Amino acid sequence: MFLDDLIIVKHQGKQFIKDLTKASLPEIFRGIPQIADETINTQELIDFCPTAAIFLDKNKLAIDLGKCAFCGDCQMQFPNKIKFTNQYKMATNNRDGLIVYQGETKEIKVEASLIRKEIQSIFNRSLKLRQVSAGGDNGNELELGACGNVNFDMGRYGIEFTASPRHADGIVVTGPISENMVEALQIAFEAVPEPRLFILVGVDAISGGIFAESTALKRDFLSKVHIDLYVPGNPIHPLTFINGILELTRKKYRR
């Protein structure tokens, strides 16, 4: 039992977090990556990524965290080129903000200029969300459930998940959005009273992930809605989600 407790502490940190905005995670956690200037076979690294998250932009390597599965294989194969930090604050309302370039120490955050005015004025004290799994694998769904447990307790900030979209202020989508879930997702979205939030959680929801080229997906619904927040991860960490929501809806938590 004691050994099990030590393993939990090593991988997840302390089991009760007093301040979710100042918490730190163990070094083993894979958060925002850094790309060094080390000379390698660039094409070999690009081809190595299973989700095409690594690419060249103006002769500089870049990683798109909206596509990254955070598998860590690139770091293991090219340890002198790529290193994942334990920085978990990487939710943003700017899709391009999820791209990390070679040689930079990236800070990913919610951009105040892109936040709709009504969000801050209406949802700055209480926020109810309806989660829709659109072909998800239960990984992100489990982590979202953990956001409300005694360890993270996002309810202390007035943030909760609700059973009905009619009782919600926004929709949280997980999964790559399979064709069979499009109608259900649209019904849930339209049932939420305006103004409503629309949040994509996890690599599958943001880009399709490893299923991006699958004919079973139908993601054109995303072009019809305003996306308020992207939360990268595979699966996401509760601290990433909670801090992203706080930055989006509460001015005092923005960096």
What are these regions, as identified by a protein language model?
Residues 1-52:
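Ferredoxin-type iron-sulfur electron-transfer modules and their immediate structural context
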Residues 142-144, 152, 158-226, 231-242:
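Cofactor-cradling patches in redox/metallo enzymes
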Residues 45, 57-60, 191-194, 198, ...:
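Ferredoxin-type iron-sulfur electron-transfer modules in oxidoreductases and energy-metabolism complexes
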Residues 241-249:
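Short amphipathic C-terminal alpha-helix that caps PH/PH-like domains
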